[in-house]
Amino acid sequence: MGLLDGRVCVITGGAGSLGLASARRFLDEGAKVMLVDLEGATRARALADLASPNVDAVAADVSQATGARAYIERTVARFGPIDVLFSNAGNQGPVVPVTEYPEDAFDALLAVHVRGAFLACKYGLPRMNDGGSVIITSSVVGAMGAPGSVAYVTAKHAQVGLMRTVAREAARRRIRVNTLHPGPVDNAFQLRIEQGISRLAGVDATRMLDEMIPLARHARPEEIARSALYLASDLSSFVTATTLMVDGGMRG
C-alpha cells in the first residue's frame, strides 16, 4: 500500500520540472493526480510521460479566480474531494536592480506566486477532505535576500505569511499547511535565473551558488519531489505551519 493510496492530489504548475517529478512520485505511491498548467504542449508531454489512468490535466490561469475555481471543480468532478493541494505554479521576472525593475513584471510575478497560492487555498480548502495537506512551493530565497530578484524574493516571503495564516485557520479540520523551500535545482527554470544573475553580476552564477551550498551541488527535481511526498503524506502528520528547507544546507 502506497503512502498516498487512493488520495486525490492537485498540482499547479504540474507539467513543469518540480510538478512533474512530484506527480510521478505521487502516482507511484497510489495517488490520483490532476495537473494544472497553462502550456498545452507541456501538458500533453506530461500526460504522455506519466502514462497513467490516474492522472489528468487541465489548463487554468492560477492567478484568476475563474481559473482557480475551474481547476478545483475539474479535479473534484474527475477524482472526488481533494486530499493534497499542491500550489506549485511559478513564473520568472527579469534579474535587475530594484530601481530598474519593471512594475508590470513585479505585479505579474506576485499574481502567480502569491495571488495564485491565495486563490488555491480560498477555493481549494472548501473542497478538501478533513485531514488533508496543503503545500506551497516557496524557495530558499523565501528566507533570505537575493539582489536583482526583488519580485521573486518578495513573493516567496509573502507565501510564508500566507501559509502560516492558513495553517492556523485550517487546523480545526486537521488540514496541514506548509511551505516547501527548494534551493537551486538542476532544471531549466533555475538556469534562466542563473543566466540573469551572471549577466547582472558578471560571474558564473551556477558555480557561485554551488560554492554557497555545503553539499556543493544543485538539487535534482526528484529530491524536491521526495520532500513534497513527505509533506503530502501521513509521514508529516504532526507538521504544520512550518517551512521545509530542501537547500543542501544553503541556509544553515
Language model features: what each stretch is:
Residues 121, 155, 163:
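Active-site helix of classical SDR
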Residues 139:
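Residue(s) in the substrate-gating loop at a strand-loop-helix junction
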Residues 8, 15-17:
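Conserved glycine-rich cofactor-binding loop
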Residues 96-98, 102-107, 209:
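Substrate-binding pocket helix/loop in short-chain dehydrogenase/reductase
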Residues 179, 187, 203-235, 239, ...:
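C-terminal helical subdomain
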Residues 171, 176, 239-241:
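Short, small/polar-rich loop/turn modules that mediate ligand/substrate recognition or access, typified
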Residues 92-95, 144, 229, 240-252:
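Short C-terminal tail/terminal secondary-structure segment
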